[in-house]
A protein has these predicted regions:
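N-terminal beta-alpha lobe that positions the nucleotide/phosphoryl donor
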Residues: 1-216
Length: 216
């Protein structure tokens, strides 16, 4: 990175990710002679944490969790309303999300764009496209990037799954295009396993991601 169009960077993360950026900002200043003003956004339990002390500025998000819709307690680093207030209050010009929390939230990248704040990462539109494994594989193919043989799109019926499996050969994988963490994925070693794997992958994907779509 050289000649950034921003100076005040809010860190929407904590612990090691936050410290890594603070250190990188100092190294950038030494190398380029341009200062990046780091702003640590922290919650109450972290008020004495190293990343809070080492940042140029710190802003409290309050309690570590908030009550989200549905009555669930979630991290305050996921509370868009609170984050928006913090970004405005600190006059942040850019946001570094690190990893986890809002780092892969397209809606948060959109929020930053609406506020005129640079999101250091991909755009919300790009996240949405690459977050879907079917769309991302199609984009890769369009760019002539080699990809493993696959169904070429969603496989909606068992009949189509059998046709694609015959073309691809066994063993193969059935995978949901959304989410991750090993959910919605099944290994199929032979034709006798296909039906159960296809139905269970779709069922698990719907429960985990609200979408029954799968591909081979």
């Amino acid at each position: 990175m050289s000649n950034p169009s921003f100076n005040r960077v809010a860190i929407v993360n904590r612990g090691e990710p936050a410290m890594r950026f603070i250190i990188a900002a100092r190294e950038y200043e030494q190398e380029h002679g341009e200062r990046l003003h780091t702003i640590a956004l922290y919650t109450d339990p972290d008020r004495r944490a190293m990343f809070v002390r080492e940042a140029d500025e710190a802003y409290s998000l309050g309690p570590a969790t908030y009550l989200a819709e549905g009555g669930q307690h979630k991290s305050s680093y996921l509370d868009y309303e609170r984050l928006e207030q913090a970004l405005i209050a600190t006059s942040a010009e850019a946001v570094w999300p690190g990893w986890g929390f809002v780092a892969e939230h397209a809606a948060f990248a959109d929020l930053c764009e609406r506020l005129g704040i640079v999101f250091i990462g991909p755009t919300g539109d790009m996240m949405r496209k690459l977050g879907d494994k079917i769309t991302s594989k199609q984009i890769a193919e369009k760019a002539e990037v080699p990809v493993a043989p696959w169904s070429g799109g969603e496989v909606a019926t068992l009949e189509n799954a059998r046709l694609h499996a015959e073309r691809l050969g066994y063993p193969l994988m059935i995978k949901a295009p959304a989410g991750g963490g090993g959910r919605g994925i099944r290994r199929v070693r032979n034709e006798s396993e296909l039906e159960d794997a296809f139905e269970s992958a779709r069922s698990e994907a719907e429960k985990a991601f609200g979408n029954r779509a799968v591909f081979l």
